[in-house]
C-alpha cells in the first residue's frame, strides 16, 4: 500500500480497542415506537462496570466487534447500532443489573424469529466480560409483529371449529409415553375421548420409533377420534406429533394428518427449531389444521434465574412463529411455574394488549395489534383436586391436560376421563353461580363426588398427592 493510500484509508479511523460504552451506552436515547426493546439481566465479571457490560451486550448483539474496524466508516453506526439506554440494579441481588437495549428495526429480517434470535441472543451469551446473562423480556413493536402470520387460527377460530364455549378444554397425554403399539395406543385414545375429554396427545418424544411408526399411529388415532365422535356427538382431536428429523418429513406427516381429516397436529418447537415451526404454522393455516406446541427443552434455556432466556420471551417468539396451543406451566402441578410470573406470560399469549407490570415480570407494554392469541396449556402432575384452582387461575381460554391424572384412575382410562370432565363441569357451574373456587374448591369437588362414582374414586386415589417445592424462578 502506498503512503498516499495509507493516508486516505486512515482519515477518521483510529485502529485499536476502545470501551464499548463510548459508542453503545447512550442514556439520553429516547426509544422509538419501531425499536425492538430488550431487558437483559446482566452479571458482569469482577471489575467490569455495569455500563460497560450493558454496552457490550448492545454492541455484540448488533453492529459491534472486539476492535475498531475501518469499514465502520462505510455505514451509519448511529442508524444501525443497538443502544444500552438504561441500567438499573436488581433488588436483592449483588452485582446484577437490568440493562435495557434498543435495536433499530432494520437489523431484523421480516417474519423471521430465527433471525431475530440469532442477532439478539446468538453470540453475546458467551462473552467473557459477562459472568452470566439472561434475556428477561422483549418488546416487539407492531411494525415488526405485523410481518408475522402468527398462530394458524387463534382462540376464537378454534372454539368455532370445535363448537365448544364457556369452559376450559380438557386433554390427556397418553402414557406410558413410549413402548405402546399403535393399536393399543389408539385404544387408549378412544377410551379417553369417549369418557369426555376434548383432546388426547402424543407425548413430546413420540415421533416414529421402531415400536410405533408414525403412519400406524396416525391411522389408529384417527379411527379412535371418529369412533368417539360418533358415540358422543362432540368434536374430538388428538395431537398428532408431526415433529421429524427434517422439515420435509415434518410436512409430509402434517399432509397425511390433513388427508385423514383430523383437526390438529403437534410440534416440538424448540427442538424442532423456529424455521421448521413457522413453516408448519403456515401449512396449518392454509389447510385448516390447528397446531399444538410442546415446549420440550425449554427448561434448559429458561430455568436458571441469572442465565438464559426467560420463558416469557420464548412464549412471545412462539406467538410470532405460530401455534394455537402451548404448554405454559401449571402453578399447582409437578413442573416449574410461579403464579404471578406464569399469569404474566399467559396474558402475553392470549391478550391483544398487555400493560407493563413488573410485579408479574412484564418489563414492557406489549401491543400485538391483530396477531391471534394462543391457548395456554396447563400440564404436568395435575389431578381432579387441582381442578378448582386451575379453572380459577387459567379461566376459560385454556387447555387443562391430565396424563397420569386420567390414565392413573383405578378403574381405567374412560372412568379417568369421566372424573375429569365431571370435576370441570362442576367447577364451571359453581363459578358461574358466583361461588369462590379458591376458597370452596374442595367442597365443590366433594359435592360432585356424590353423583359421580368415577370422580369419587379419583379423589380417593389422589387425596394425598402434592408437589411442594420452592420455585426456582421468582421475581
Swiss-Prot record:
Propeptide: 1-2
Site (Transition state stabilizer): 334
Subcellular location: Plastid, Chloroplast
Residues bearing PTM N-acetylproline: 3
Annotated keywords: Acetylation, Calvin cycle, Carbon dioxide fixation, Chloroplast, Disulfide bond, Lyase, Magnesium, Metal-binding, Methylation, Monooxygenase, Oxidoreductase, Photorespiration, Photosynthesis, Plastid
Gene3D superfamilies, per database record: Ribulose bisphosphate carboxylase, large subunit, C-terminal domain, RuBisCO large subunit, N-terminal domain
A GO biological-process term: photorespiration
Modified residues (N6,N6,N6-trimethyllysine): 14
Keyword Amino-acid biosynthesis appears in the UniProt entry: no
Residues annotated to bind Mg(2+): 201, 203-204
Cofactor dependency: Mg(2+)
Membrane-spanning ranges: none
Molecular function (Gene Ontology), one example: magnesium ion binding
Cofactor note: Binds 1 Mg(2+) ion per subunit.
Binding positions (substrate): 123, 173, 177, 295, 327, 379
EC class name: lyase
InterPro entries found in the cross-reference section: RuBisCO (IPR033966), RuBisCo_large_chain_AS (IPR020878), RuBisCO_lsu_C (IPR000685), RuBisCO_lsu_C_sf (IPR036376), RuBisCO_lsu_fd_N (IPR017443), RuBisCO_lsu_N_sf (IPR036422), RuBisCO_lsuI (IPR020888)
Catalytic activity: 2 (2R)-3-phosphoglycerate + 2 H(+) = D-ribulose 1,5-bisphosphate + CO2 + H2O; D-ribulose 1,5-bisphosphate + O2 = 2-phosphoglycolate + (2R)-3-phosphoglycerate + 2 H(+)
Alphabetical list of SUPFAM superfamilies matching this protein: RuBisCo, C-terminal domain, RuBisCO, large subunit, small (N-terminal) domain
Modified sites of kind N6-carboxylysine: 201
Listed GO CC annotations: chloroplast
Cited function: RuBisCO catalyzes two reactions: the carboxylation of D-ribulose 1,5-bisphosphate, the primary event in carbon dioxide fixation, as well as the oxidative fragmentation of the pentose substrate in the photorespiration process. Both reactions occur simultaneously and in competition at the same active site.
Assembly and interaction partners: Heterohexadecamer of 8 large chains and 8 small chains; disulfide-linked. The disulfide link is formed within the large subunit homodimers.
Name of protein: Ribulose bisphosphate carboxylase large chain
Organism of derivation: Platanus occidentalis (Sycamore)
GN (gene name): rbcL
Amino acid at each position: 500500500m502506498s503512503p498516499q493510500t495509507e493516508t486516505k484509508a486512515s482519515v477518521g479511523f483510529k485502529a485499536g480497542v476502545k470501551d464499548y460504552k463510548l459508542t453503545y451506552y447512550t442514556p439520553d436515547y429516547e426509544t422509538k415506537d419501531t425499536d425492538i426493546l430488550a431487558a437483559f439481566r446482566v452479571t458482569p465479571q469482577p471489575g467490569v462496570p455495569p455500563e460497560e457490560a450493558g454496552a457490550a451486550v448492545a454492541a455484540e448483539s448488533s453492529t459491534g466487534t472486539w476492535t475498531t474496524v475501518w469499514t465502520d466508516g462505510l455505514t451509519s453506526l448511529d442508524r444501525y447500532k443497538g443502544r444500552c439506554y438504561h441500567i438499573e440494579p436488581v433488588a436483592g441481588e449483588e452485582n446484577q443489573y437490568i440493562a435495557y437495549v434498543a435495536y433499530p428495526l432494520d437489523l431484523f429480517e421480516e417474519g423471521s424469529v430465527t433471525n431475530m434470535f440469532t442477532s439478539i441472543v446468538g453470540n453475546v451469551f458467551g462473552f467473557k466480560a459477562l459472568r452470566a446473562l439472561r434475556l428477561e423480556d422483549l418488546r416487539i413493536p407492531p411494525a415488526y409483529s405485523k410481518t408475522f402470520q402468527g398462530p394458524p387460527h387463534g382462540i376464537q377460530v378454534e372454539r368455532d371449529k370445535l363448537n365448544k364455549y364457556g369452559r376450559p378444554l380438557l386433554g390427556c397425554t397418553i402414557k406410558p409415553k413410549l413402548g405402546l403399539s399403535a393399536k393399543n395406543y389408539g385404544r387408549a385414545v378412544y377410551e379417553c375421548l369417549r369418557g369426555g375429554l376434548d383432546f388426547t396427545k402424543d407425548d413430546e418424544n413420540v415421533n416414529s420409533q421402531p415400536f410405533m411408526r408414525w403412519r400406524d399411529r396416525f391411522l389408529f388415532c384417527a379411527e379412535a377420534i371418529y369412533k368417539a365422535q360418533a358415540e358422543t356427538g362432540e368434536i374430538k382431536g388428538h395431537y398428532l406429533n408431526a415433529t421429524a428429523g427434517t422439515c420435509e418429513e415434518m410436512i409430509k406427516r402434517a399432509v397425511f394428518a390433513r388427508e385423514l381429516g383430523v383437526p390438529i397436529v403437534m410440534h416440538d418447537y424448540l427442538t424442532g427449531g423456529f424455521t421448521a415451526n413457522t413453516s408448519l404454522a403456515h401449512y396449518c393455516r392454509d389447510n385448516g389444521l390447528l397446531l399444538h406446541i410442546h415446549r420440550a427443552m425449554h427448561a434448559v434455556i429458561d430455568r436458571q434465574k441469572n442465565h438464559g432466556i426467560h420463558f416469557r420471551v420464548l412464549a412471545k417468539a412462539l406467538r410470532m412463529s405460530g401455534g394455537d396451543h402451548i404448554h405454559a406451566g401449571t402453578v399447582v402441578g409437578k413442573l416449574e411455574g410461579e403464579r404471578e410470573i406464569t399469569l404474566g406470560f399467559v396474558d402475553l399469549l392470549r391478550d391483544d394488549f398487555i400493560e407493563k407490570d413488573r410485579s408479574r415480570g412484564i418489563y414492557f407494554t406489549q401491543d400485538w395489534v391483530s396477531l391471534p392469541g394462543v391457548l395456554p396449556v396447563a400440564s404436568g402432575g395435575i389431578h381432579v383436586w387441582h381442578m378448582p384452582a386451575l379453572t380459577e387461575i387459567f379461566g376459560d381460554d385454556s387447555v387443562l391436560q391430565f396424563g397420569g391424572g386420567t390414565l392413573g384412575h383405578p378403574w381405567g382410562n374412560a372412568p379417568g376421563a369421566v372424573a375429569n370432565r365431571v370435576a370441570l363441569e362442576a367447577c364451571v357451574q359453581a363459578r358461574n353461580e358466583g361461588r369462590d373456587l379458591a376458597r370452596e374448591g374442595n367442597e365443590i369437588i366433594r359435592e360432585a363426588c356424590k353423583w359421580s362414582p368415577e370422580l369419587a374414586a379419583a379423589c380417593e386415589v389422589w387425596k394425598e398427592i402434592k408437589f411442594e417445592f420452592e420455585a426456582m424462578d421468582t421475581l
